Amino acid sequence: MAGPSLACCLLGLLALTSACYIQNCPLGGKRAVLDLDVRKCLPCGPGGKGRCFGPSICCGDELGCFVGTAEALRCQEENYLPSPCQSGQKPCGSEGRCAAAGICCNPDGCRFDPACDPEATFSQR
């Protein structure tokens, strides 16, 4: 009698765990869910047309980049938000993302990068 009830308890506990069974695995496995939790960084700059790329960096396609200026002050709020954020579409440089035409930014700063220039991309084809 103890054997079947023990087996039922173990099966019940197994069903309640957060294991990734074949039928309910997310695409890319269990750890792929962590990548989906990235939100867009806070808007910043004139008219909120830019996005934060670091604690003192605000960039936008129409604006260019503001580094350490009043336009980038709002970006300091990102330090107090619990979830990670990501700005820019295309990865570039060392852990950076394209911030504006020809500019690649990471949380530490920005630099010119031809990979972020849409006109250069089309002219190379």
Curated annotation (Swiss-Prot):
| A Pfam family of this chain | Hormone_5
Query: What's one GO BP annotation on this UniProt entry?
Result: response to mechanical stimulus
- Disulfide bridge partners, by residue number: C20-C25, C41-C85, C44-C58, C52-C75, C59-C65, C92-C104, C98-C116, C105-C110
The molecular function GO annotations come to: neurohypophyseal hormone activity; neuropeptide hormone activity; oxytocin receptor binding; V1A vasopressin receptor binding
What InterPro entries has UniProt attached to this entry? Neurhyp_horm, Neurhyp_horm_dom_sf, Neurohypophysial_hormone_CS
Which positions carry Glycine amide?
Answer: G28
Write the record's keywords in alphabetical order, separated by commas: Amidation, Cleavage on pair of basic residues, Disulfide bond, Hormone, Signal
Annotated signal sequence is 1-19
Tell whether Signal is among the UniProt keywords.
yes
Q: Name one GO cellular component term.
A: secretory granule
The UniProt family comment states: Belongs to the vasopressin/oxytocin family.
Q: What does this protein do?
A: Neurophysin 1 specifically binds oxytocin. Oxytocin causes contraction of the smooth muscle of the uterus and of the mammary gland. Acts by binding to oxytocin receptor (OXTR).
Subunit organization: Interacts with oxytocin receptor (Ki=1.5 nM). Interacts with vasopressin V1aR/AVPR1A (Ki=37 nM), V1bR/AVPR1B (Ki=222 nM), and V2R/AVPR2 receptors (Ki=823 nM).
Record-given protein name: Oxytocin-neurophysin 1
Name the source organism.
Sus scrofa (Pig)
